[in-house]
């Protein structure tokens, strides 16, 4: 599957994580961002790209920001924004603790300090 624009729900989550991570001009970053779904059983993880040529980078991987929320079925979900060695975000990892598909991204999130 190719890259696409984030949905409104994905955009809301990505913008929250970008703000926590201290990304300069997070709204502009989001406007330029394209995403591609990852094979994760439907939990919602995304590969991130500002240009079609962006590729995940090998080397150091940094967790830039994480939030937690409950899916509409009550199961806890952790969403983490990862960046490569040049601090360019390349992945949104979404982990639903029971590994079931994500039903809905909520409107509020709880920041995970770390």
What function would you assign to each model-found segment?
Residues 71-114:
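Short, compact, well-ordered microdomains
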Residues 1-67, 103-114:
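N-terminal domain-onset segments
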